Amino acid sequence: MKVVDMHCDTVLRIYDEGGSLLENDFNIDLKKMLKGDYLLQNFAMFVNLNDSVAPLIKAQQLIDLYYNEINKHPDIIKPIFSYQDIIDNQNAGLMSAMLTLEEGAVVNHDLAILRNYYRLGVRMITLTWNYPNGIGYPNLSNANDHHDLFSINTKDGLTDFGIEYVKEMERLGIIIDVSHLSDAGFYDVLKYTTKPFVASHSNARGICGVGRNLSDDMIKELAKRNGVIGINFCGDFLKTIPNGNARSCIEDMVKHILYVKNLVGMDNV
């Protein structure tokens, strides 16, 4: 069975720690992907708004690193810009790489910059990380407080600019990713858009009640829109333990997969 992984931070790890996409000590490299029979890997360019490097600059640096690493191995993997590219790569015996952004605010409140990210090959954007960002709000109100994992924001959704932002994403053909977004923001995306969207790395709140996961109703609404939820392998989002820092294990991942399957079917997980 071919693997589609909707989110990884490998490019950031290489940026911070050095190393190669071909082979490294992280969770994802090309050799591991080949062994796992990957079809598609989404590579997230994660930018922390509190970083010392300006967000717009950091995003550009990460995108440059992404292409430099991918283009070293044209016999193994190629970047994709459309669904047809995935099919063409598979027929050619190649894996596919999709460029994504994790932090929508790297556009500096300017939709012209959003359009330029599309021209650079970005095909999915996670609207927020763990801070309010001018586009919307996360469920977390304090990214450094473990207990805040259970907070759920049903009040603060997309801003006026955020509504313009998601509409422009749809027009361009950039997939909207609602992982990290507040509950109110999720329902705003549902209200102001018409195409399928995704939660690239979220789990079922019915099993693990943290705010990063989706409620049953959210999963059902996502499925009605023909969207997809990508299971998150982070232990704290797989199961709840009193002191946090839950260990990630395959049994817990399977529980979430089966939970979503029983709720809406396998086509949406």
Language-model features: where?
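N-terminal hydrophobic targeting/anchoring segments and the immediately downstream early-domain regions
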Residues: 1-152, 209-269
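Active-site core of metal-dependent hydrolases
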Residues: 127, 136-137, 144-221, 230-235
